[in-house]
Every structure is written in C-alpha cells, then in structure tokens.
Design a protein with these regions (language model features):
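Minor-groove-contacting beta-hairpin "wing" of winged helix-turn-helix DNA-binding domains
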Residues: 205-209
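A short, conserved structural fragment
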Residues: 194-204
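Auxiliary N-terminal substrate/complex-recognition segments of SAM-dependent methyltransferases
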Residues: 123, 136, 188-191, 217, ...
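Short amphipathic alpha-helical interaction segments
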Residues: 179-195
Length: 229
C-alpha cells in the first residue's frame, strides 16, 4: 500500500542527451504553465486519496512521511556509509565550525573507500584537518552559522510545517535587533508575500500557503537576501 509519493519538476541538466535535444529543437523545453497545471492535478488527486503535502514536492498519508528525508530538511545528522556516500555530523571543540556541522563525502571508488577504512588511501589526510574521521572520507565542508541559517530557510520553508521565526535568528539569537536594517527588510519581505497570499506568518511560524508552493524558490531567495546571507 502506498503511503507517500513525490513529484518533482523536470530540470534539463547541461551536458545531458535531453539538453542537446532541447537545444536542437527536437524536444520542447519544460514549460512553467504546464508544470503548474500538472502539479495542480497531482495535488488534487493525492488529496482525494487521503494524502497531504508535507514538503513542496512530497505527499504522505498520516504517519507516512519519509523520516530519512526529514532529517535532511531539518538540518539533522546522518552518517553516509559506502563508496560515494554523503554524511553530515555535528562536531564540537577547538577548530570546528561555528555551527559544529560538517558535511562529509566518501571516496567514490570502492577500492579507495575500503583502503581508506583500512587506514590508508587518499582520505587519510582528512584526519589532519582536526576531524576524527575515517580515511574513507575524502572531502569535508564546515558549515558556518550563516551557512546553516541559509539551509534552514531554504529547506524548512519548503515543509508544510514551515519554520519558527526564531530559526531566522543569527548568532546573536535574534532575527535582527529592533529597527535594524536586517529586521526591517525581512519584515517587508514577509509582509509583501503575506499580502499576496503566498506566506502565512500567523503565530510564531512562517509557512508557505498552497499558492505559495509554486513560487517557493523566489520567496526563499528574497528571505535569504533580506537576512544578508
């Protein structure tokens, strides 16, 4: 029995066979109006079947939400196991990033990955970066507080639950001191989109409305810019 479903818009990636065919006129380019119509149809059909949207591109029956993806969208931690796997862990202590979150990428080649786990290989140098990681990890990216705030806005605002206004706070613990430029610009952006019926800012949370889902990327971009990130 299906308890969740996903529907993503088609993105034509550079360097693909489809991109070349679109460029030559052999295939039509994705059309935003067509996408909106199809999204409407999918949303209506899923709602009739007892599904609710919990992320812009994801629907589920009660209790059927994908917990794995929610960890990503809520800035949680996970460990990537296997060649080419990605992870994100929180580390504390001297030399670690402000947020403590570090993204990890394992070696793609299986032989290199297993060699790294055995204590050798190219990933061994990562351990000299002050991080207690296995040699299978070949890339790390430390997330600053601003990086984390940007991701929180980008990902959590796409959730039906939205995000708490306090999650827009910076390292000072507030979304901008009263009267500050950041606070004023953010308030103006929120007011504009709530006036258009695209955002719901009631209570202590900021949420996309059903109509706002279609313009989620633009709304998120404007909020991030207003925060100076």
């Amino acid at each position: 029995m299906c308890i969740r479903d996903s529907a993503y818009s088609l993105i034509v990636e550079d360097g693909t066979a489809m991109a070349r065919k679109v460029r030559r006129g052999e295939l039509p380019a994705p059309d935003e109006d067509t996408f909106a119509d199809r999204y409407d149809a999918i949303d209506a059909r899923l709602r009739q079947a007892g599904f609710s949207w919990y992320e812009v591109s994801n629907w589920a029956k009660p209790g059927g939400e994908c917990q794995h993806n929610l960890i990503y969208w809520r800035s949680g931690q996970w460990w990537g196991a296997g060649p080419g796997a990605h992870g994100c862990v929180r580390l504390r202590g001297e030399g670690h990033s402000e947020s403590g979150l570090v993204r990890l990428v394992n070696a793609k080649r299986p032989a290199t990955y297993w060699d790294g786990l055995a204590g050798g290989g190219e990933g061994a140098s990562i351990r000299k970066d002050g991080l207690p990681l296995p040699g299978s990890v070949v890339t790390t990216e430390r997330l600053s507080n601003d990086d984390l705030r940007t991701e929180q806005v980008m990902l959590r605002l796409r959730l039906a639950a939205g995000l708490e206004l306090t999650e827009l706070a910076g390292s000072t613990g507030s979304a901008g001191s009263a009267g500050s430029k950041e606070n004023t610009e953010l308030a103006q952006v929120i007011e504009r989109y709530t006036g258009l019926g695209l955002l719901d800012a009631r209570g202590e949370r900021l949420r996309l409305t059903d109509k706002g889902r279609y313009l989620a990327d633009g709304i998120v971009t404007d909020i991030v810019l207003a925060l100076g990130l």
